[in-house]
Amino acid sequence: MRINRYLRLFAAALVLFFAGVVYAWSILKAPLGEEFGWTPAALALNFTITMCAFATGGLVSGLLAKKVPAQLRVAIGGLLGGGGIAAVSFLSGEAILLLYLLYGILAGFSIGMVYNTGITTPTGWFPDKTSLSSGVVMMAFGFSTLVLGKVLQAMFDSPAFGWRKSYLLLGIGVVVVSLLTAPLIRTPKPGEVPPAAAKKATPGENFPPLGMMKRISFYGLFFVCTFQAAVGNTMISFAKDFSLSLGASASLAVTLVGLLSVCNGVGRLISGALLDKLGLRKTQYIMALVLMTAALSGLAGVLAESLVLGVCALVLCGFSYGFCPTFSAAATLHFYGGAHYPLNLSIINMTLIPTSFMATLAGGLVESSGGYLGVFLVLTLAALLASVVNLCLKKA
């Protein structure tokens, strides 16, 4: 039976929606700190470990792409990742190293495998809509924190569940969804892609990983993705406190954090549509404009103590952050071809490692200076550098 390619896209989006919960650490960590007395710094370290393992898992998935079927990578990644999350429910207060091992390393690494597979596989079914298909699954991944995060928060507060049962059910959910969707997530066989779609595909020159890494454009792309993601990731890390500093009420600050997440998800879909409609070059100009406007709005908001400008900065940072993964996927495919796409993209996604440390450094700057002026000066400089380099990226 021929399965519609949109059903396969839905399967990839669904598994990434559940896998994306690994990013909801700001919510998932709360009951652990309360029950075990683990410090914010110790819990923050777990997220850094998670991001490093996530990027490494994506790299391993890329290395295995030509040897291990996508279905098997999703199934194994989901099984181990969900198992790691579920195992956290059995932790005691003396076992923070086990938290790092189970959630940080095991779940982070395994879900990184699922992410790489879920992002790269749909493009084979949509050669006519590569960026839009990537944007759809990336939006699902981004919305996970907002939707599942709220569900988990309610479960934590409910006497019927509590944090232990919530972690257990979450892990089981990741396992079940991964195993159910895995059979649908595979690369197309010859003749399976609709002829009308295949005709629109425009394959370019194919670069193997080492060939890609010999190109100056690779380092430019890595730089752009690192600094653009750093701006968004940093803003996410202090969005609530930043809003409060500009006079927002506690409830409004929480709402604005949610709004930033929504914009992040929508930005992934919009950027995918723009990339397919306008092409890479024109989208790069839009991307640079949004990033610079976001950083300058935040800086102006701090200087003028304006909540309105602060809200603009949060919204635009969300959109800008959403552009980043879709752009990196499209640029990798456009510059370096599809023959080695899963592995090449996993190498580009190693930007997650330096990015995860930048948000921590920004938090230290806020703490030491007692305000956000220094941070936004740094973010504006980072945005400027990323935008300039981005506009210089024209070919492989």
Where are these regions (language model features)?
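Extracytoplasmic gate region of multi-pass secondary transporters
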Residues: 25-29, 213-269
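Intracellular juxtamembrane helix-capping segments at the cytosolic ends
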Residues: 32, 113-126, 133, 323-336
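Interfacial helix-cap and linker-helix signal at transmembrane-aqueous boundaries
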Residues: 32-33, 64-65, 151-160, 243-244, ...
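Helix-to-loop junctions at the C-terminal end of transmembrane segments
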Residues: 57-70, 268-279, 367
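C-terminal ends and interior cores of transmembrane alpha-helices
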Residues: 80-93, 291-303
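Hydrophobic core of transmembrane alpha-helices in multi-pass small-molecule transporters
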Residues: 96-112, 309-323
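Helix-loop-helix hairpin linking two adjacent transmembrane segments in secondary transporters
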Residues: 141-187
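C-terminal transmembrane helical hairpin of 12-TM major facilitator-type secondary transporters
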Residues: 260, 269-270, 277-331
